[in-house]
């Protein structure tokens, strides 16, 4: 999603405790957790099966249907998609997921709202987007 002056939303993770934050506006100040700067998450940089991690979405009218992977991602206790985020030209929507659920999310768009990006976060293989 583009924020002030075309800034892309960024995600950061703490290498100590695993906290993840979403930065929607960047004023150049580092994000700190556990006494150290957090590490920026980059989408799709982990060596993992692309066909199971990259989100795929369809839009029908005001309905957005997102699925993680052309081949659905496993949703096991030890390996699952934690969340799916839809970024639009007007806002950000997130669905939290748990093991055993399907790696899918449904969202509704408002008038004039357009999809910009869809992100998915795998507990083992990190951040992915389309």
Language-model features: where?
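Short Cys/His-rich "knuckle" micro-motifs
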Residues: 23-28, 41-44, 130
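Cysteine-rich micro-motifs
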Residues: 27-37
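Exposed aromatic-hydrophobic patches
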Residues: 67-68, 104-111
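Residues immediately within or flanking Cys/His clusters that coordinate Zn2+
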Residues: 11, 30, 119
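Short amphipathic, basic-aromatic surface patches that mediate peripheral association
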Residues: 68-76
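Cys/His-rich microdomains that often coordinate metals
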Residues: 21, 37-38, 126
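Short cysteine-rich clusters marking metal-coordination/redox-active sites
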Residues: 14-17, 33, 122
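Short acidic/polar inter-strand loop motif in beta-rich domains
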Residues: 123-130
């Amino acid at each position: 999603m583009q924020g002030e002056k075309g800034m892309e939303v960024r995600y950061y993770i703490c290498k100590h405790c695993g906290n993840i934050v979403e930065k929607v506006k960047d004023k150049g100040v580092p994000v700190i957790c556990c006494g150290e700067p957090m590490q920026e998450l980059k989408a799709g940089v982990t060596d993992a099966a692309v066909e199971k991690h990259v989100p795929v979405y369809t839009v029908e009218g005001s309905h957005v249907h997102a699925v993680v992977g052309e081949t659905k991602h496993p949703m096991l206790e030890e390996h699952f998609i934690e969340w799916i985020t839809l970024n639009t030209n007007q806002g950000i929507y997130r669905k939290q997921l748990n093991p055993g659920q399907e790696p899918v999310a449904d969202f509704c768009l408002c008038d004039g709202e357009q999809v910009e990006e869809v992100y998915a976060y795998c507990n083992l293989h990190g951040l992915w987007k389309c």
